Amino acid sequence: PLAEKCSMDGIININKPKEMTSFDVVAIVRRACGTKRVGHLGTLDPMAEGVLPITIGRAGRVMDYLDTDIKVYRGSARLGLETDTLDIWGNTVKTCEDFSIDRKMLDKAVEAFRGVIDQIPPMYSALKVGGKKLYEYAREGKTVDVKSRKAYIEKADIISFDGCEFEFEIACSKGTYIR
């Protein structure tokens, strides 16, 4: 059985698909391995896909030492659209089609994010305040005062741009929100 194969301590990388939470992945590994000693190194949004490092058994003890490096994210954004969740899956709250921006202007705007920045975590995030996740407050229609935090953006590059949408790659510190 698979549970016998998982009676080990270690770290595995799982390519988390869209529409699955990081905890869903942990639950699947727990069932497959027959152990509760499973964790993950950082949360990926449910609609994000990518590598999610999973610790099994005693490997969980090294999480604090491994989860400090720079993380790299690749994504896309649409200009002129604002949603209540700050991502494409939220309800549109504002649109603007009357804008003109070229690649040079976009590169300059992105450049301002490089280095150490102050960032207010979004309401639709797993950050806990008062023992409750911010997205739980948001789903109840409540807002919570969230203090800004320092984040470090090592690299922020535009990969492609068509005048309205662009692809980007960002290398950033743990705890940075990319929306």
List the predicted regions and their residue ranges.
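Catalytic/RNA-binding core of pseudouridine synthases
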Residues: L2-R179
